[in-house]
Structures are given as structure tokens and as C-alpha cells.
Amino acid sequence: PYEKIGAELVKEVAKKTDDVAGDGTTTATVLAQALVREGLRNVAAGANPLGLKRGIEKAVEKVTETLLKSAKEVETKEQIAATAGISAGDPSIGELIAEAMDKVGNEGVITVEESNTFGL
């Protein structure tokens, strides 16, 4: 039963990460699996589950705070192209994304669909 709960938790983490960020599902899944595994191990060793939960919540707050402090705004077309190129693993795709974002503006929506046609 614990394994099923853990598996459902990991699936939900991946889905939420994809819905909110559109990226990072592998990292979120690995982190969730580690939290479940280590949490169960600690509870089995006698740790208080509520104490573990409070510790995890404090750690999440600290990590979030640290990430927000180190985050950098991506504003220019060149910055968008560089960031998107890294995420896509291809600078030319980064350029396409930056161009599309330039055309639709900050409030615009860009839909990307997979194509079966070579080169498109």
C-alpha cells in the first residue's frame, strides 16, 4: 500500500510540475522519489512523521527563498533565445522561440505541436 501511495505521489508531482512549469518533470520525479524513500526509511527507524513533514516544509521554504534570490529576469530577445536554446538543446530552436515570443508579446500564447513532416 505504501508503494502505491508513493507512486501516485510521484505521478502527481510530475503532472503538477509539467502543468505549472512545462519543464523539470525528471528533476521533480527524482526529488519526490528520494523524499518518499527517505521519509519511509526514517519513519521505519522511529522518526516522527509529523516532525519529518515540518522539516520538509521548512526545507522547501528555504530552497524556494534561495532560488528566488538567485533567479535572474529574462527580458531581452537575446536572453530569451539563449535560455530557450539551452532548454531545447538547440540554439536555432531558441531563436525561433524568441522570435515567436517577440511577435505575441508578454501576454501572448505560443502553441507548439509535433509534426510528422520532416523539417517542420
Swiss-Prot record:
Entries under Pfam families matching the protein: Cpn60_TCP1 (PF00118)
Keywords: ATP-binding, Chaperone, Cytoplasm, Isomerase, Nucleotide-binding, Stress response
UniProt superkingdom: Bacteria
GO molecular function terms attached to this record: ATP binding; ATP-dependent protein folding chaperone; isomerase activity
Catalytic activity: ATP + H2O + a folded polypeptide = ADP + phosphate + an unfolded polypeptide
SUPFAM superfamilies found in the cross-reference section: GroEL equatorial domain-like
Task performed by this protein: Together with its co-chaperonin GroES, plays an essential role in assisting protein folding. The GroEL-GroES system forms a nano-cage that allows encapsulation of the non-native substrate proteins and provides a physical environment optimized to promote and accelerate protein folding.
Alphabetical list of Gene3D superfamilies matching this protein: GroEL-like equatorial domain, TCP-1-like chaperonin intermediate domain
Binding residues for ATP: 23-27
Similarity annotation: Belongs to the chaperonin (HSP60) family.
Annotated localization: Cytoplasm
Keyword Lipid metabolism: no
Protein name: Chaperonin GroEL
Broad class of the protein's primary localization: cytoplasm
One Gene Ontology cellular component annotation held by this UniProt entry: cytoplasm
Membrane-spanning parts: none
Organism: Mycolicibacterium agri (Mycobacterium agri)
Source organism phylogeny: Bacteria, Bacillati, Actinomycetota, Actinomycetes, Mycobacteriales
Oligomeric form and interacting partners: Forms a cylinder of 14 subunits composed of two heptameric rings stacked back-to-back. Interacts with the co-chaperonin GroES.
Residue ranges the record marks as coiled coil: none
Listed EC numbers: 5.6.1.7
